[in-house]
Each structure stands twice: as C-alpha cells, then as structure tokens.
Amino acid sequence: MTPTAVRRWDVVVRRLPLYASGAFVVLTVFLSVLATLTYRGHGPGRTGAVLNGPAWLDAWFQGDSGWYYRIADSGYFYTPGHQSPVAFFPAYPLAVRALGLVLGGDWSTAAGWVTLISALGAVALFADWARTRLPPRTAVVAVALLLLYPYSFFLYGTGYSDALFLLTTLGSFALLERRHFVLAGLVGILATGGRPTGVAVLIALVVRALEMLAEERAARAAPRVPVSVTSGRGGVREADERPERRAGPVPLRELCGAVRLVRWRQLAVLVSAAGLLGWMVYLGVRFGDPLAFVTVQGAPGWDQGSGPYTWFKALFVATVLKGMWPTLTLLAPQALACLAGVLLVPTAWRRFGWGYAAFAVVSISIPIIGTKDFMGAGRYMLVAFPLIGAAAVVLTGDRRPRWLAPAALGLAAVGLCIATVAYVSGVEVS
C-alpha cells in the first residue's frame, strides 16, 4: 500500500464512527424503501389498532414484534404449557413502553424508533471499538460487515431487541476499557436483562477485567525499549522509553493469577448480574417459576425444550434427510453462520484476547445448544461482535486477494436485501 493510500485510510479511521453512522442512516433509508414497497405489494395485512404509525416503520413490524407490542401494552402473563410473553426479557419492551407513552401509546412506532436509535449508537460504538484494535482497512471492512450481514436487517427498524442488546453490550465494554467499572456494571444490567445471552456479557466483563489487570502487571514487568516521539508545535523529536509490547493475549496462567489483584472497583462489574437476577426474582414472585423464560420454550409451537432432541439438532437432521428444501433455505444459512462463528473463535481470541473471546463463545453456544434447528441463530450471531471483527481480519489478511473482501461484502449485501424482502413478506427468516 502506498504512503498516500495509508494516509487516506488513516483519515477514514479517525472519523470511522461518524462515517459508520452516516452509512447506517443511508442503509436505513434504502432498506426502509425496499421494505415499504415489499409490504405494500406482498406483506401480510395488519390491523390499524396495532399499526398506526408511518408506513416505512409499520413494514418492519413482523414476527415476534407482536409479542413486544403486547408486553409494552399489557405487561406479562404466563400460562404453563402455552406460548407466553415471559419468553422475552424485559429491557426492550420497557424501553418501548417508555417511548410509547411519549408517543401517545403508539407501541409499534416506539418499537421501531427504539431499534433505530439503539442501532445507530451500536454502530458508532462498534466502529470505535474496531478502529482501536484493527488496521485501518480491516476496521472499515469490519464495520461494513456489521452493516451488511444478511441478518443485520434486525437493526433497521424491526420490533426486536437485538439492537438495544448490542448497544448495551458494546456500551458496557467501552466503559470497562476506560476503567469505569461501576458504570460498566450498571449498563451491563440492561444487557443481562435484555435477552438470555446477556449472561455472556456478565462472564466477559469479569474475564476482561481480570485480563486488564494481567496486562497492566505484564506491562510493568516488561523491559522498556527506546522510542522516538514528536512533541511541540515544532515537531521536535524526543527520546522516550515504553514497555515492550507482547503479541497475542496474556497467558492463561497470568490471567488466573490476576484474581489476587482484584479490588472492590473491579468487582463492580458483577453488578451487571442484577438484570438477570431481577428478572428471575420477578418471575418467581409473580408466576412461581424463576426460570419461566426457559420453561416456556418447550410450549407447543415453539418446541424448544431442553434435552438431546434439541442439543443434537434432531429436527434439523430430519429436515436434511427428508430434503425439505424450502425449510432448508431458511435454516442452512443460519447453520453455516454458526459454523463460521465457531471457526472464527480462535482468530477472535488471538486478536482481541480472553474477554472478547469469552463473550463470543458464550454468545454462540447458547443458540447452538438451545435451538432445535438453528432457527434464530442468524440474528444471535449478529450481536457476537468480536466474531465480526475476526471475520474482517480473515478477509483482509496479507495472503488474501484484494478482491476477496469486496466480493464478500457484495454477497452479504445481496443476502441482506433478500432477507429484508422475505422478512417483510411474513417469512420467519431468523
């Protein structure tokens, strides 16, 4: 890469959160037009009592959006053995209700705006995270992957919780990296109270806090090497000494050894568990089952009960053996996304360390183990953001052809458009 090209990439990366936010707005407009045209031509009918907002937002109100509408409007109920809203964690519907009250009880419009605002913040935070850990071109590709991932349509106005969960997850990590341990724990409450995979945030915050302690201790013990720095308006070069940087994550032994360095301020990240614990206490007190969000998954129609039938994907295997191609068209891409996620974990660990690898592992393990046929796994992979960064690393490696990343992004963009049309047409895409 020429020096001029390097400088151009550097300029882009310095403003990457701003550019990423602008790209998100442009894609929101484009996909909303596509969704509106699709909805008017092929979308299922909806009653005005539910959808009384602008058409470009109403088009995104499909699938489980109705459950969040019901929770925001009427609260929770639980009928054992039947599908019930306790399957859905409270952070997102509470946010929808809060905004909906401002909008005069228009819950569907509120749901769309909560998603859009959350997604805009999440994209900016991800861009900031990527630019501090990846080379300039790789960081740009990582942001593009987040925006164009086929299941990223859930970020562009749907009544789903993915955008808010991604925002609170990235926010808690951003605060942790700045040593705001209490604030990281408080924002983490929204994440663990946002969806079942919120437990991944709790685990990862703890691991990352330990990792930061281990890194600080290693930096103090590392030999110092001379470097030249530029200071002053005249560009005077001065000698300085900095710790020698060690490539890769800290050894596991040092990570475990950092436990004895923990102080009360680091323990504050454990506050993030309050979201999940509070939800379980509510379910236990009101419905007599603190794990109702797990129990209800086995209700007829969802049939996501735990056990070997679910763990070993018996239904998915049967679907493959019977050659049920229309169903496989929906399930196979999500199974491939899970496979790609598993394969990317080592790269995420080498590049981003133990904490982010722990988040990725737990995030993808829950849908892989907990779904009977991989349905829903595609959007669960969306929030495993370290894997998106790892995918960008793979696509832009030194041994990769320059056309590989643009080709992959182009293919992803086509998939995003197809998934959007299918979703708005009432197809259960993920």
Residue ranges and their predicted role:
Residues Q83-P90, L94, V102-G121, L155, ...:
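Loop-to-helix entry region of an early transmembrane alpha helix in multi-pass inner-membrane enzymes
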Residues A98-L101, W113-R133, A340-P346:
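Transmembrane-helix motifs of polytopic, lipid-linked glycan transferases
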Residues L270-A273, G397-E428:
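Signature aromatic-anchored transmembrane alpha helix within multi-pass, membrane-resident enzymes
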Residues D106-T109, F126-L148, L167, W354, ...:
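Transmembrane-helix signature of polytopic, membrane-embedded enzymes
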Residues T28-P44, W60, L202-L343, G355-A360:
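Membrane-lumen/periplasm interface segments of specific transmembrane helices
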Residues V114-S118, L134-R137, V141-A174, L183, ...:
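Multi-pass, polyprenyl lipid-linked donor-dependent membrane glycosyltransferases
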Residues A59-F77, G81-G104, G307-F316:
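Short hydrophobic/aromatic helix or loop-helix immediately within or flanking a transmembrane segment
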Residues M1-V50, L261-V271, L404, A408:
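Start-transfer (signal-anchor) and selected internal transmembrane alpha helices
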